[in-house]
Each structure stands twice: as structure tokens, then as C-alpha cells.
Swiss-Prot record:
It comes from Escherichia coli (strain K12). Residues 654-677, 915-938 are annotated as: Disordered. TraG* probably arises from the post-translational cleavage of TraG. InterPro entries: TraG_N_Proteobacteria (IPR012931). This is Protein TraG. Its main location: membrane. Residues 1-53, 351-412 are cytoplasmic. Residues 923-938 have a biased composition (Basic and acidic residues). It is found in: Cell inner membrane. Residues 74-329, 434-938 are periplasmic. NCBIfam families: PRK13735.1 (NF010295). One of its GO terms (cellular component) is plasma membrane. Keywords: Cell inner membrane, Cell membrane, Conjugation, Membrane, Plasmid, Transmembrane, Transmembrane helix. Plays a crucial role in donor-recipient cell interactions. Required for two stages of the conjugation process: pilus biosynthesis and mating aggregate stabilization. May interact with TraN.
């Protein structure tokens, strides 16, 4: 178990060690450590490349082993807090690299402090390791300021001192003021022989004699300054509020402190009662001097108080330093514990290991020298205070406070030197003492030089003080010179002053009434410059319901200019199938040729069609080409301009047809034909009709056109629009908004203002109209009825004397409005607009006729369509007549074909049977039977 000794903050240091122990056991620390080791390996590799020194590698290995031991080996630590020895602070799994230096340095520091205080034995109240820096001396200073915290004792004690104690001194001469000031037990002195005649008033305003009051005060003081009393409890909680046994500590340490410094054997209760009595006497004497107006006593007391405040203000710096530096030592120790992981990461690099570890150990040693220096300083100061002690009496009370103020200020000032002095002790003792001496010398020379300079310059400042709002010995050396002015008061109460240079200065404040109501007339001219930055957030909800109808009249004139240009690419594919009125005639011609050829050769129509088609061209190929060029030159009629256009194109098509037929048949036919004169005619008719009738076309074409055109168009348009619109609107609007705005603005303005105060005129108006109530109306501000009457008269005054002037100014300004503005010309009437429109329309009609623009194209097209439709109808009727003839011939040929087909079928069957008949038998089956019978016979 490793012990760590600290001055204070043991629980906080335990939390620091727990945090470090927990952090260095996590994966995060492992990752950080591996990264640091990797970087150190890279550093060693770089050094090896530069120097090829084996000692660099061995040094890195040694550092790696050392760091592993410091981090991976864990131990337990017990923190011993000197400010709270009851609690036990134990921390496990602390790295040995942190636990060993911390434990070693703190144990050495604690042992040195304990050894020093054991050799120079002092009570616990003045021992640094037990109660802190100058605790006993501070306890004595606080005890001299003990005041009763019981309100009943405070009021009664002050009256008792003023009426009873001072009366015994100055009237009855029972004891002198010097006896009271030098008495070591003023409590017994002031209550020894109280007057039975003089008295005081208690809290119930009952008169009690000094004798009776002394009994009451003694009983209350004894109870108030013992354990459980109000004053006892207040100061115990103020000094030892956080301790579990504050009453016991207060009783023991106060007695020890007074015993050490003054050799007193009184108990803490007696000491408190004595000091409360002294401070009550001091307050009572001061209050009596203030009541009697004793200026000399006030100045004396003020001087003493001023010196005490000056000393206490000086010592406050030392007190702050004495209280804060031990806590700073604890906090720095905690910081040294907290940065241990960072130091380990830095120590991984073998070039930094020794310097980092050395600096860490030196820092811990530096912090542990603080308590030793504190103990030495505390011992020296308490020894000095004991040797230069003064008795605690009323006359020495201020001197005691002064002495301990000096003691505390010196100790605090020296304690501020402990951190640099302790570091110099570690580094070099002689230089440290030299630095401290130089600081002390400069601090003493500076105020001395300042005081000497004030004396040489003659700048003195003494006795600038205030005591209980009483000013004394006021002396002013200011010089005021005033001459050459003449001032007189006018009949209205104002003042007029004529200065030395002849100017007149008027002051009308004495002639003005200050009334509960103010009436002003103001004319202002202002020029403002404003800069504003605003940031706002707005949220709104609205609902709107409305109805509207409107009537309006408008006349429009339009002028327009346009310009266009462009280019285009196109690809076209199509398939055409056409049939005209001539197709039906050619079809009839082909059918007639087929039938004639079939009859001539005594063959079927199908065979005739094939033979006629085979006599024509069986395959055909056609190629078509077309190319054209077109140009255009145009000049506009109504304006200036022209255009040139060029278009080129090419088209190619391929038409093809293929006819192929296959036929298989078996039959026997006997025919004889001697007619061949119609074959050529039938073949020619079939060929011509076939060529005319069959026409199919598939075409694909592509074209690209680029055009550039410049054109100018002048357009004249006349339009007449007449509209009437009436509009009525009714709107219901509901808006709900939430806004948050932040605005920063800067405004710079300059204004000129003329203001006239009409309060006095209103006062005269009230005197004239209500002379019997003028005072109440002009001065009574508490009555609502009077206020209402005053408001009515003020409004009447404004209407009678102020409003007419405002209205006259408004009328004059209104007449001047619009004088510098030009009149707005009125437009022409509707007849002028219609006449203008008719004139423009006549110009357009004339230019249209000059351009030979026809307007009967639709009628001409309709006539042509009607004519063409009639011709097509006649052709259709002719085709239908021929179609009926063809259908008749077709029916006849069909019947003949059926007859011939039946005859041919019969002949086919007979011929087939004849071919299948076998000699010697009528059928194969019969022939087989005969063969079997012959076989059996054999």
C-alpha cells in the first residue's frame, strides 16, 4: 500500500486517480499507446538511417521496457487528507509509474513537515499541519470582533453603557475611563456597582433602573455566550461550520490560542463574554459621542477606524493569498496526476524519456516543498506574535487588531513568494533568495518614493473622512468673483439680467406655473440619418372571404416588330397504294383475255392466267430519280425589304416485283385445237392491263434545308375596344400572427424645434372662467372630480385658443398645395377615337387592294371540288355497269367450269381404275388369292 499525503482535496484527488486508472485500462489507451510506440519506432528508424548507432536501438529497447513496467505494473494507493483524517480514500490499479513518485514525494514532504513541527512544538491551534496558516492568530483577530447576535442584548447594552456606565464614570466617579480601558475584566467592573436611580427603557418601553438592568444583562450574556447561545452558535458555525464537532473545536482552539499568545487560562465562553462586553462598550461610547456632537471624539474615532480599515484592506491581499495557495497546491497536484498518460506518451520516444521523467519528478518535489515552507513561515509568525503580545483590554483592542493585521499581511505576502522560492530551492537556492530579496526591496522602495514625491510637491491630503453623516472642519479656498451684472425681477415674476457687455439674459422660470396638466404648442424641423439592422421571424395565418364585380373602360394601341430565322432536317418514309377509276376497266380487260385464252385452248382460267403471266416479264426492276431547284425573290408591298430563297432536293425509288409459281398435277387429257389467232391479242391485252393495274411504291427520302432571311415588317393596326365594368367588393379578413424580432438600430438626427409652453395662459384661463375654484383646479391632484373638471377645461382651452391657430395654418397650407404642379391634359372623346380608327382602317383596305390580295379563293375551291366529285361519280357508275357485265360472264364461266370439272373427275376415276387393273385378275386381292391356290396345288 502506497500512502499519498495531501493538504486538502483528498476526495477530488481520489477521483483523479480513479479516472487515470480506469482510462489506462481501456482499449482506447491501448490504441493510443500503440500509435505512440509506432511513431517512436519510426523515429528510431530515422535515427538509425542517419547515424547507424546501435546505442539508439538499445536505448529504445530500454525505454520500452521501462515504460512497460511503469504502465503495466499496478498497485494500490491510499490518500491521507490532513484536513479530514476521518475519511479513508483508497484507489486500486494505479500504474506504478504514477503511484511511486507521488507516494515518495508526498511522504518525504509530510515527514519533513511533521519532523519540523515535532521539534518546534506548538499547540494545535497554531500548528500548520493541524489547522493551517496562522489559524490561532486569525482566531484571536476574529474573537476581538465578537458582537452579540441577540437583538434584546444589543439594544439594552448600548443604552446601559450610555446611561449607566458613562454616568458612573463622569457623574459618580465610581471608576475612571482609564480604569475601564485598562481593565482585563470589564465585565465585572461595569456590573459591580450599578446606579439604583438612573435607568433605561426596555423593549416594552418600561423604565428599569441600572441595577435591575445589570442583572438582566448578566443573565442574558451568560446564556448567550455559552454552548447553545445565539452568539456562540453564530460564531461557531462561521468558523467551524463544516466540521462534525464544531462546539468542541471552538472551545479547545480558542482557549489554546489565548493561552499560547497571552498566557490566559480563561475558557472559550469567558473569552467570548469578555470580548462581547468590550465591543458593546466601544459601540456605546461611540454612539454617545455622536449623540452629544463631540466633534473631537468623532475625529479621533474616525482616525482610528480609518487606520484599521487601511490595515485590513492591506491585509486582505495576504489573507486571499494564504487561503488560495494551499488550494492551488492541491489543484496543481491533481493536474500533475491527470497529465500522467500524456507524459507516458511523450516518454515513449527515447530522446525525450529522461527529460520528461526528470521534469515530472522535479514538479512533484516542487509541490511538496510548499507545505514545509508554509510550516516554517507559520512557526516564525506565531513566535513573533507571542513575543510581541499585548494584553487584550479595551485600550489595546485596536493595537491588537493592528498587530495581527501586520502579521497576516506579512505572512500572506511571504506566502506569495513560496512557489517561486520552492522552485529555486530545487534548481538553485542562492538565486532564489536573491530574487525574493529583490522583489521585497522594490516593493518597499516604491511606496517610499511615492510618499517622498508627494512631500516635495506639497500635495497633502489628510483627514478626508465622514463619520455617521457628520462633516467637520470643512475649508474651501475657492475664489468666486462676480461684478458688472444688473439683475431685476419683472412684474410677471421672471428675472432679467444685464451682463457686463450689455446683453440681456431672460429667465422666465419664475413666471411659469408648474401644473398637473401641461399644454404645449410645438413646431419642429428635423433631419435624421438612421442605420438599422433587423432580423425577424414571422408566422401568420389569414382567412379571406370576398366578392367583387367591376366596370372598366379601355382603349389600346399596339405596335409590333418580329424577326425569325432557322434551319431544318427531315427524313421521310412511306408506302403508297393507288387505285383509280381506270383500274376497274383494266381488271375487266384482264378477265376477258384470260377467258378468251382458256376457251381457245380448252384450259382452265387458272392455267390460262399462268400461261399469260409467263408470257409477260416475270421479273422487273425500275429506278426513278428526280431533282429540282427552286428560287424565289420577293419584295414587300407595305414596307421596305426583300428575300431570296433556294431549295434543292433529290429523290430515288426502286420498284420491284417477282412472280414465281409451282404446280404439280397428274391427269390425262386429249385435246385438239387449231385456233391460234387470238393468242397474241389475249397476251397483249393481259400484259397492258397487268402493267396498268399493278402499281405499288415504297419510297424513302431525306432532305436538309438551311435558310437565312432578313425581313422587315411594318404593321399598322387599329383597334377599338369598348368595355364597361362595375366593381363592388366586400372583404372579411382575419389575420393571426406570431412574430419574434431582434433589432439593432443606430439613429443620428438633427432637429430644430420651436416650443411654446401654454401652461401660464391656461392658468389665466382658469382664473377667468372659474375664479372661485382656481386653486383647487390648478393644484389638487388627489380628487378624481377635480381632475375630470381640469381635463374638461384644458380641452376647452385647446379648442378656443390653440385649435383655431392650427386650423388657420392648415387652410393656408392647403391653398398652396398643387400650385407648382402642371395640369393633366384630358383625352379626346369617343368620336375622335372612332374617326381615327376608321381612317387607319381605310389605309389598310387600300393597301390590300393594291397588293392584289384575293378574297374569293374559297368560292373557287368549292366549285372545283363540286366538279371533281361529279366526274368521279359518273366514272363510278360506269365502272359499276361494267362490273355487272363481268360478274355475269364470271357466273357463266363458273358454271361451265364446274361442269367441265365434274366430267374431268369422272374421266380421271375411270382412267385410274384402268391403270390399277392387273392382267389375270380384277384386283390385287383376287390375284393374291389365285396365287395362293396355285401354291397349294403344287
Amino acid at each position: 500500500m502506497n500512502e499519498v499525503y495531501v493538504i486538502a482535496g483528498g476526495e477530488w484527488l481520489r477521483n483523479n486517480l480513479n479516472a487515470i486508472a480506469a482510462f489506462m485500462g481501456t482499449w482506447t489507451w491501448d490504441s493510443i499507446e500503440k500509435i505512440a510506440l509506432t511513431l517512436s519506432v519510426l523515429a528510431v528508424a530515422v535515427m538509425w538511417v542517419q547515424r547507424h548507432n546501435v546505442m539508439d536501438l538499445l536505448g529504445w529497447v530500454a525505454v520500452f521496457v521501462l515504460i512497460s513496467l511503469l504502465v503495466n505494473v499496478r498497485t494500490s494507493v491510499q490518500i491521507i487528507d490532513n484536513s479530514d483524517l476521518v475519511k479513508v480514500h483508497r484507489v486500486d490499479n494505479v500504474p506504478v509509474g504514477l503511484a511511486m513518485p507521488l507516494s515518495l514525494t508526498t511522504r518525504i514532504g509530510h515527514a519533513m513537515v511533521a519532523s519540523y513541527e515535532m521539534i518546534f512544538t506548538q499547540p494545535d491551534s497554531v500548528t500548520y499541519s493541524k489547522t493551517g496558516m496562522l489559524f490561532g492568530a486569525n482566531l484571536i483577530v476574529k474573537s476581538t470582533d465578537f458582537l452579540s447576535r441577540n437583538p434584546e442584548i444589543i439594544n439594552l447594552f448600548q443604552d446601559y453603557v450610555q446611561n449607566c456606565v458613562l454616568g458612573d464614570i463622569y457623574l459618580n466617579h465610581k471608576y475612571t475611563l482609564e480604569d475601564l480601558m485598562a481593565s482585563a475584566d470589564p465585565y465585572t467592573l461595569i456590573f459591580s456597582r450599578p446606579s439604583p436611580l438612573r435607568g433605561v427603557y426596555d423593549n416594552n418601553n418600561n423604565f428599569i433602573t441600572c441595577k435591575d438592568a445589570s442583572v438582566t444583562l448578566k443573565d442574558r450574556l451568560n446564556l448567550d455566550t455559552k454552548t447553545g447561545g445565539k452568539t456562540w452558535h453564530y460564531y461557531v458555525q462561521q468558523i467551524f461550520g463544516g466540521r462534525p464537532d464544531p462546539d468542541l473545536l471552538f472551545r479547545q482552539l480558542v482557549s489554546d490560542s489565548y493561552s499560547y499568545f497571552y498566557g490566559s487560562s480563561q475558557s472559550a465562553s469567558q473569552i467570548m463574554r469578555q470580548n462581547v462586553t468590550m465591543n458593546a462598550l466601544k459601540e456605546g461610547i461611540t454612539s454617545n459621542a455622536a449623540r452629544n456632537g463631540d466633534t473631537a471624539s468623532l475625529v479621533s474615532l474616525a482616525t482610528t477606524s480609518s487606520m484599521e480599515k487601511q490595515r485590513l484592506a492591506h491585509v486582505s491581499i495576504g489573507h486571499v493569498t494564504m487561503r488560495n495557495l494551499p488550494m492551488v497546491q492541491t489543484i496543481l497536484t491533481g493536474i500533475a496526476i491527470g497529465i500522467f498518460p500524456l507524459l507516458i506518451l511523450a516518454a515513449v520516444f527515447n530522446k525525450l524519456t529522461l527529460s520528461v521523467l526528470k521534469g515530472y519528478v522535479f514538479a512533484l518535489m516542487w509541490l511538496q516543498t510548499w507545505p514545509l515552507l508554509y510550516a516554517i513561515l507559520n512557526s516564525a509568525m506565531t513566535f513573533y506574535a507571542k513575543q510581541n503580545g499585548a494584553p487584550v483590554v479595551l485600550s489595546e483592542l485596536s493595537q491588537i487588531q493592528l498587530k495581527y493585521s501586520n502579521l497576516a499581511s506579512t505572512a500572506g505576502y511571504l506566502s506569495a513568494m513560496i512557489p517561486p522560492l520552492s522552485w529555486m530551492m530545487v534548481k538553485g537556492l542562492g538565486a532564489g533568495f536573491s530574487s525574493v530579496y529583490s522583489h521585497f526591496a522594490s516593493s518597499s522602495i516604491s511606496p517610499t518614493a511615492s510618499a517622498a514625491g508627494s512631500v516635495v510637491d506639497g500635495n497633502y491630503s489628510y483627514g478626508n473622512m465622514q463619520t455617521e453623516n457628520v462633516n467637520g472642519f470643512s475649508w474651501s479656498t475657492n475664489s468666486t468673483t462676480s461684478f458688472g451684472q444688473m439683475m431685476y425681477q419683472t412684474g410677471s415674476g421672471a428675472t432679467a439680467t444685464q451682463t457686463r457687455d450689455g446683453n440681456m439674459v431672460m429667465d422666465a422660470s419664475g413666471a411659469m406655473s408648474r401644473l398637473p396638466v401641461g399644454i404645449n404648442a410645438t413646431r419642429q424641423i428635423a433631419a435624421a440619418q438612421q442605420e438599422m439592422a433587423r432580423e425577424a421571424s414571422n408566422r401568420a395565418e389569414s382567412a379571406l372571404h370576398g366578392f367583387s364585380s367591376s366596370i372598366a373602360s379601355a382603349w389600346n394601341t399596339l405596335s409590333q416588330f418580329g424577326s425569325n430565322r432557322g434551319s431544318s432536317d427531315s427524313v421521310t418514309g412511306g408506302a403508297d397504294s393507288t387505285m383509280s377509276a381506270q383500274d376497274s376497266m383494266m381488271a375487266s380487260r384482264m378477265r376477258s383475255a384470260v377467258e378468251s385464252y382458256a376457251k381457245a385452248h380448252n384450259i382452265s382460267n387458272e392455267q390460262a392466267t399462268r400461261e399469260l403471266a409467263s408470257r409477260s416479264t416475270n421479273a422487273s426492276l425500275g429506278l426513278y430519280g428526280d431533282a429540282y431547284a427552286k428560287g424565289h425573290l420577293g419584295i414587300s408591298v407595305l414596307g421596305n425589304g426583300g428575300g431570296v430563297g433556294l431549295q434543292a432536293g433529290a429523290k430515288a425509288s426502286i420498284d420491284g416485283s417477282d412472280l414465281d409459281s409451282h404446280e404439280a398435277s397428274s391427269g390425262s387429257r386429249a385435246s385438239h385445237d387449231a385456233r391460234h389467232d387470238i393468242d397474241a391479242r389475249a397476251t397483249q391485252d393481259f400484259k397492258e392491263a397487268s402493267d396498268y393495274f399493278t402499281s405499288r411504291k415504297v419510297s424513302e427520302s431525306g432532305s436538309h434545308t438551311d435558310n437565312n432571311a432578313d425581313s422587315r415588317v411594318d404593321q399598322l393596326s387599329a383597334a377599338l375596344n369598348s368595355a364597361k365594368q362595375s366593381y363592388d367588393q366586400y372583404t372579411t379578413n382575419m389575420t393571426r400572427s406570431h412574430e419574434y424580432a431582434e433589432m439593432a438600430s443606430r439613429t443620428e438626427s438633427m432637429s430644430g424645434q420651436m416650443s411654446e409652453d401654454l401652461s401660464q395662459q391656461f392658468a389665466q384661463y382658469v382664473m377667468k372662467n372659474a375664479p372661485q375654484d382656481v386653486e383647487a383646479i390648478l393644484t389638487n391632484t388627489s380628487s378624481p372630480e377635480i381632475a375630470e373638471r381640469r381635463r374638461a377645461m384644458a380641452w376647452s382651452f385647446v379648442q378656443e385658443q390653440v385649435q383655431p391657430g392650427v386650423d388657420n395654418t392648415w387652410r393656408e397650407s392647403r391653398r398652396d398645395i398643387g400650385k407648382g404642379m402642371e395640369s393633366v391634359p384630358s383625352g379626346g372623346g369617343s368620336q375622335d377615337i372612332i374617326a381615327d380608327h376608321q381612317g387607319h382602317q381605310a389605309i389598310i383596305e387600300q393597301r390590300t387592294q393594291d397588293s392584289n390580295i384575293r378574297n374569293d379563293v374559297k368560292h373557287q375551291v368549292d366549285n372545283m371540288v363540286t366538279e371533281y366529285r361529279g366526274n368521279i361519280g359518273d366514272t363510278q357508275n360506269s365502272i359499276r355497269g361494267e362490273e355487272n357485265i363481268v360478274k355475269g360472264q364470271y357466273s357463266e364461266l363458273q358454271n361451265h367450269h364446274k361442269t367441265e370439272a365434274l366430267t374431268q373427275n369422272n374421266k380421271y376415276n375411270e382412267e385410274k381404275l384402268a391403270q390399277e387393273r392387273i392382267p389375270g385378275a380384277d384386283s390385287p386381292k383376287e390375284l393374291l388369292e389365285k396365287a395362293k391356290s396355285y401354291q397349294h396345288k403344287e
